[in-house]
Amino acid sequence: MHRLLLVAVVGAAVIACSKPAGGSTDGAAVFGSVCAACHGPTGKPDATMVARLGVKDLTDPALRPTLTAAHVEAQVRHGSANKLMPALEGALTDVQIKAVAAHVASPAFAPMR
C-alpha cells in the first residue's frame, strides 16, 4: 500500500512539474525540470527512489547502451511497462520529448555523475 501511495505522489509531482518554465525545448532544461524529480539532477537517483520505486540509474554503464534516443523517447511518451514511470505525452510537447530523449541518449550525459 505504501508503494502505491508513493507512486501516486511521485507521479503527481512529475506531472505537475512537467511543463518546464517558458516551455523550454532544451533537453537539459527539460530533464532538470521534469525527469530530475525521480532520476536525480545528474541521472543518478537517490537510494530511496531506487529501493522503493525501482527508478533506473541513467548513468549506469550497463544501462547506457540501451538508452538510445528512440528508446528514451518511447519511455517518455508512453511511460514504463510497469507503469511506475508515467507517460508524459501530452504533458510535454513533441519537441520537448525529442530534446530530452536526445539529451539522455547523448554520450555526454553519462559522465554527469
Predicted segments with their positions:
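Sec-dependent signal peptide recognition
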Residues: H2-V10
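Extracytoplasmic electron-transfer domains, predominantly the class I c-type cytochrome c fold
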Residues: R52-P107
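C-terminal motif of bacterial Sec signal peptides marking the signal peptidase cleavage site
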Residues: A13-A16
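Periplasmic/extracellular electron-transfer cofactor-ligation site
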Residues: P20-L53, H78-L84, S106-R113
